[in-house]
Amino acid sequence: MKVLSLFNGMNTGRQALENVGIKVEKYYSSEIKPYAIELTQYHFPDTIQVGDVTKWREWDIDWKSIDLVLSGSPCQDLSAAGKRAGINGSKSSLFFTFIEILEHIKSFNPNVLFLQENVGSASKLDVGIMSRALGVYPVRINSSLVTAQLRDRYYWSNIRVKETMFDLVTDIPQPKDRGVMFKDVITDGHVNCDKAKCLMEGTISKNSSKTPNSFSHQEYLKKRERIGMLSLIYEENNELRVKTNTKQGYDIVTENDCIDLSFPTSTTRRGRVIKGKSPCLMESNNNLYSYKNGIVRTVNQIEMERLQGFPDGYTSILSKSKAGSLLGDGWTLPIIEHIFSFIKPI
């Protein structure tokens, strides 16, 4: 199979194809982030990097040979976490570049397969626009079925379709629920605070870092305090609490809960304590915390990998921030494996 992957990110598509036993002859990757390219070439050095997607007409590709096109066009303008500029926003409008490329390939190979992914919080209007452009309506799958992460996504594909009375729809069934919970992805070394940031209101005395007075630790706390994070978590009546905009005014944190401190300055925020699962990883991922053995700390790199279904250490050649950026922007590996399992032999 010859594959063209647009907005390739951390190369989840290639890994998923390998995992389900589909032989890849050539894999073209369009990606501009240097650390994403570094990770891709580390795992799959035969990947052919073609560069900026907006310069696709300059690419040296045998277009008629492409069997599968993958696209995870930027979703920032569609996401509930973004500014809701919509499909015509400066980033999400790259979807139409994907459409141009797909139509170009179809002129040589009408049977080319495709997969397009985008956020579940996209508006009905934008979903309709994308569906009409692709000629098929999406299936909606939450990664919580196969991982410990709540990650709601739309997937458009002609890998398997069915006709309804009015439309053609993506006919990928829901994957079986694996029952993976947040507590299942927390690493055994949870209480080793030399490698974890412990966050509590004010200075941390109980169950704090072994080096609470170190310069880096204090600077980290100061940064979090400046944006309001430390004042959100506090102890009272032998309970760990997180401030929320509810009648009670707080949520109680219990063992193995995930704490979401995104939008720390919001005065209307609810649901900061998530039971059982983690909220969706995002590109800026430093706002998720785990609570275990009296310790509150940021999720570590291995835990982020597990939340997206990757093997431990998959991103170990990168820093935590760079790995988190790719994982937060990327696809959930077991979901893509599930979709690709329906590809018929060529």
What annotation goes with each model-predicted range?
Residues Y35, I204, T332:
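Conserved Rossmann-like nucleotide-cofactor binding loop
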